Curated annotation (Swiss-Prot):
Name this protein carries in UniProt: Small ribosomal subunit protein uS11c
Entry-linked Pfam families: Ribosomal_S11
Family to which this protein belongs: Belongs to the universal ribosomal protein uS11 family.
Lineage: Eukaryota, Viridiplantae, Streptophyta, Embryophyta, Marchantiophyta
InterPro entries: Ribosomal_uS11, Ribosomal_uS11_bac-type, Ribosomal_uS11_CS, Ribosomal_uS11_sf
Gene: rps11
GO cellular component: plastid; ribonucleoprotein complex; ribosome
Superkingdom classification of source: Eukaryota
Any one Gene Ontology molecular-function term assigned to this protein's record: rRNA binding
Subunit composition and interactions: Part of the 30S ribosomal subunit.
Length: 130
Protein backbone atom coordinates (compact mmCIF):
# COMPACT_ATOMS: atom_id res chain seq x y z
CA UNK A 1 0.00 0.00 0.00
CA UNK A 2 1.51 3.39 -0.94
CA UNK A 3 2.18 5.73 1.95
CA UNK A 4 0.95 8.88 0.26
CA UNK A 5 -0.78 10.12 -2.86
CA UNK A 6 2.56 11.37 -4.22
CA UNK A 7 4.03 7.87 -4.11
CA UNK A 8 0.95 6.48 -5.82
CA UNK A 9 1.16 9.08 -8.60
CA UNK A 10 4.88 8.44 -9.09
CA UNK A 11 4.31 4.73 -9.33
CA UNK A 12 1.51 5.19 -11.85
CA UNK A 13 3.50 7.62 -14.03
CA UNK A 14 6.40 5.19 -14.48
CA UNK A 15 4.17 2.65 -16.28
CA UNK A 16 5.41 1.94 -19.82
CA UNK A 17 2.96 2.59 -22.65
CA UNK A 18 3.90 0.92 -25.96
CA UNK A 19 0.56 1.63 -27.69
CA UNK A 20 -2.02 4.35 -27.25
CA UNK A 21 -4.96 6.23 -28.73
CA UNK A 22 -4.71 9.97 -29.46
CA UNK A 23 -8.03 11.82 -29.54
CA UNK A 24 -8.10 15.25 -31.22
CA UNK A 25 -11.24 17.26 -30.52
CA UNK A 26 -11.16 20.39 -32.69
CA UNK A 27 -13.98 22.85 -32.13
CA UNK A 28 -14.22 26.35 -33.52
CA UNK A 29 -13.13 27.78 -30.15
CA UNK A 30 -10.45 25.37 -28.87
CA UNK A 31 -8.51 22.19 -29.65
CA UNK A 32 -8.24 19.46 -27.01
CA UNK A 33 -5.77 16.57 -27.33
CA UNK A 34 -6.35 13.55 -25.06
CA UNK A 35 -4.10 10.48 -25.06
CA UNK A 36 -5.42 7.21 -23.64
CA UNK A 37 -4.11 3.69 -23.38
CA UNK A 38 -5.84 0.91 -25.32
CA UNK A 39 -8.34 0.37 -22.48
CA UNK A 40 -9.43 4.03 -22.56
CA UNK A 41 -7.70 5.32 -19.42
CA UNK A 42 -6.40 8.88 -19.84
CA UNK A 43 -2.61 9.08 -19.80
CA UNK A 44 -2.00 12.66 -20.93
CA UNK A 45 -3.99 15.61 -22.18
CA UNK A 46 -3.47 19.16 -23.34
CA UNK A 47 -5.50 21.95 -24.87
CA UNK A 48 -4.84 25.28 -26.49
CA UNK A 49 -6.19 27.04 -23.40
CA UNK A 50 -3.95 25.01 -21.08
CA UNK A 51 -0.93 26.02 -23.19
CA UNK A 52 -1.53 29.68 -22.38
CA UNK A 53 -3.61 30.79 -25.37
CA UNK A 54 -6.68 32.80 -24.45
CA UNK A 55 -9.63 34.18 -26.36
CA UNK A 56 -9.56 34.08 -30.15
CA UNK A 57 -5.96 32.77 -30.22
CA UNK A 58 -7.14 29.41 -28.82
CA UNK A 59 -8.84 28.61 -32.13
CA UNK A 60 -5.72 29.08 -34.28
CA UNK A 61 -3.81 26.22 -35.93
CA UNK A 62 -0.62 27.24 -34.11
CA UNK A 63 -2.36 26.80 -30.74
CA UNK A 64 -3.47 23.30 -31.79
CA UNK A 65 0.10 22.43 -32.82
CA UNK A 66 1.44 23.58 -29.44
CA UNK A 67 -1.22 21.57 -27.58
CA UNK A 68 -0.36 18.41 -29.55
CA UNK A 69 3.36 18.83 -28.88
CA UNK A 70 2.72 19.27 -25.14
CA UNK A 71 0.53 16.15 -24.94
CA UNK A 72 3.04 14.01 -26.84
CA UNK A 73 6.11 15.15 -24.88
CA UNK A 74 4.95 13.09 -21.88
CA UNK A 75 4.26 10.04 -24.07
CA UNK A 76 7.70 9.91 -25.61
CA UNK A 77 9.17 9.73 -22.08
CA UNK A 78 6.90 6.74 -21.38
CA UNK A 79 8.05 4.93 -24.50
CA UNK A 80 5.01 5.26 -26.78
CA UNK A 81 5.86 3.75 -30.17
CA UNK A 82 2.51 3.17 -31.91
CA UNK A 83 -0.74 5.11 -31.76
CA UNK A 84 -4.14 5.36 -33.34
CA UNK A 85 -5.58 8.82 -33.99
CA UNK A 86 -9.26 9.72 -33.67
CA UNK A 87 -10.15 13.20 -34.96
CA UNK A 88 -13.51 14.80 -34.25
CA UNK A 89 -14.84 18.26 -34.93
CA UNK A 90 -14.63 20.82 -37.72
CA UNK A 91 -12.13 23.22 -36.12
CA UNK A 92 -9.16 24.89 -37.79
CA UNK A 93 -6.61 23.03 -35.65
CA UNK A 94 -7.36 19.45 -36.69
CA UNK A 95 -4.84 19.19 -39.56
CA UNK A 96 -2.07 21.05 -37.75
CA UNK A 97 -2.41 18.87 -34.65
CA UNK A 98 -2.17 15.74 -36.81
CA UNK A 99 0.91 17.13 -38.56
CA UNK A 100 2.57 17.76 -35.18
CA UNK A 101 1.84 14.16 -34.13
CA UNK A 102 3.32 12.80 -37.36
CA UNK A 103 6.50 14.87 -36.86
CA UNK A 104 7.00 13.45 -33.36
CA UNK A 105 8.14 10.08 -34.72
CA UNK A 106 5.26 7.99 -33.35
CA UNK A 107 4.08 5.31 -35.80
CA UNK A 108 0.39 5.90 -36.60
CA UNK A 109 -1.57 2.70 -37.23
CA UNK A 110 -4.56 4.58 -38.59
CA UNK A 111 -6.18 8.00 -38.57
CA UNK A 112 -9.96 7.94 -38.24
CA UNK A 113 -12.42 10.84 -38.51
CA UNK A 114 -15.07 10.24 -35.85
CA UNK A 115 -16.90 13.56 -36.22
CA UNK A 116 -20.57 12.98 -35.34
CA UNK A 117 -22.72 13.58 -38.41
CA UNK A 118 -26.48 14.02 -37.97
CA UNK A 119 -28.86 11.98 -40.11
CA UNK A 120 -31.10 15.06 -40.31
CA UNK A 121 -31.38 15.53 -36.56
CA UNK A 122 -31.63 18.89 -34.79
CA UNK A 123 -32.00 22.14 -36.69
CA UNK A 124 -28.63 23.93 -36.94
CA UNK A 125 -28.23 27.42 -35.47
CA UNK A 126 -28.99 30.38 -37.72
CA UNK A 127 -26.31 32.36 -39.53
CA UNK A 128 -24.61 35.23 -37.69
CA UNK A 129 -25.75 38.75 -38.46
CA UNK A 130 -22.96 41.19 -37.77
Amino acid sequence: MPNSMEEMNLRRSRRRLPRGVIHIQASFNNTIITVTDTRGRVVSWSSAGACGFKGARKSTPFAAQTAAENAIRILIDRGLKQAEVMISGPGPGRDTALRAIRRSGIVLNFVRDVTPMPHNGCRPPGKRRV
